[in-house]
């Protein structure tokens, strides 16, 4: 459960939450705590006169939550990339097996013909990622 440090009537809503272009969140804190309230994802601005502001511990908790969300997003993206890579590898193996099957079938058909044919060589694989 989240509880406010001060009654919501004392907070100025237009200065309560500001997101900067760098992605940091700025929240007002009491003026004497501003120097202690700079974290990786959350920054502090001095609270205006008569504004209670947010405590430093709440900013620290918010910073930790933002960090967890970033890590979860990164893990989900890596899992999606791994799934795509696995799918591509499966398709590549299927294409390789299909190609080998076609070569083997062509060899078998060539052996049953009455004339002598040139020996069919196996498929040459090359790396498309290079």
Swiss-Prot record:
It comes from the Bacteria. This is Uncharacterized protein TP_0700. It comes from Treponema pallidum (strain Nichols). The lineage of its organism: Bacteria, Pseudomonadati, Spirochaetota, Spirochaetia, Spirochaetales.
